[in-house]
């Protein structure tokens, strides 16, 4: 009898331990799933630069086939836009049709603006603020404050290292003073700005040597890093806000980010390369 009671008691203890362990493991698993993952915003800036390289090679390949098709600024801008769209369609980060559509839609907005500048004879293609008018009511006062400070950094510095250092300090302020929702747009903007300035600092001569002599891409004035960077950031911010409204997700390595990343990448690539082409033409 004692043997049976002992066996039954042992069974109860074992069952209790099993349930306790299972509950603990389930709780840990549940906690790990709900724990937010850290976002590497640098991936957005890096993808932006990949887009610029892609478009450079796209334009180089297509102009080599028949240079006579690209006699005007509008012709060249149209080719650049097609290259931008092809990049977004093949981007490793945009993993589904919805994300690709968000990115392409946002990339079209700066090209529409640049085309209107060409048609109306407007020389300046720089937006006044670091965000398009259509998202003004969707940004918080804090976001506008930070973006205005970023505007000052881009306007008041001609040295690329000074600009990057200024943006790094601004990122510290964003992390300490802004909400999680505000940070996404702002930190993607600083990432885009840093990567864009570095790219054109390193590659502007490459673009000019490839296309400048053949197409006489020169405006007779010094290339403005600030102008490119400001358009980059502005359309990246606009694209990010619009992408967040539309929704969708972007896979960045082990991360899955909301649709603002797709919009930010699309808007920034179009804003950067379109403005740069109009400057050097």
Regions found by a protein language model. Give the residues of each.
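Acidic/polar, low-complexity intrinsically disordered N-terminal segments immediately downstream
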Residues: 3-6, 30-220
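C-terminal motif of bacterial Sec signal peptides marking the signal peptidase cleavage site
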Residues: 23-27
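Membrane-active amphipathic alpha-helices enriched in small hydrophobic residues
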Residues: 225-253, 257-281
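Sec-dependent N-terminal signal peptides
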Residues: 7-17
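N-terminal cationic amphipathic segment used for targeting or macromolecule association
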Residues: 11-12, 99-101, 187, 191, ...
